[in-house]
Amino acid sequence: MAYCRQEGKDRIIFVTKEDHETPSNAELVADDPNDPYEEHGLILPNGDINWNCPCLGGMASGPCGEQFKAAFSCFHYSKEDVKGSDCVDQFRAMQECMQKYPDLYPQEEEEEEEQPADPLPEAASEASATKEAAASS
């Protein structure tokens, strides 16, 4: 026996093997051009955040999704002169969560930190200090 269940905007239909043996008489519903979740980008027309936007790269639905949503929402709705300056705690919580999942959220390494410091200026100053010490002796 088939039945249908509504979950939010989705309708889930459960069918039996017998239901599949007969041709479907289901009517397809045309896309709603006013659907607030369809192709509006990150910010919906009413100013809310579209958490389904592919531009978020799944960040809103991963293991740190709630922390991401809290930080991003705080930043989006921030009224501070330095936008988001009141969101430090939320971003810190998101960062702490992401550090627990390094495979899912790899940290970008800055090239400057990977490069060893240039040893030439230090060697040059040591050489001139040695020359000065030798000259004064």
Curated annotation (Swiss-Prot):
- What superkingdom heads the lineage? Eukaryota
Q: Which pairs of Cys residues are joined through disulfide bonds in the record?
A: C53-C55, C64-C97, C74-C87
Protein localization: Mitochondrion intermembrane space
**Skewed-composition ranges (Acidic residues):** 106-116
Indicate yes or no for the key word Oxidoreductase: yes
One Pfam family of this protein, by short name?
Answer: CHCH
What residue intervals hold the motif Cx9C motif 1? Answer: 64-74
One example of the protein's molecular function in GO is: protein-disulfide reductase activity
Protein name, please?
A: Mitochondrial intermembrane space import and assembly protein 40
Natural source organism: Bos taurus
Gene that encodes the chain:
CHCHD4
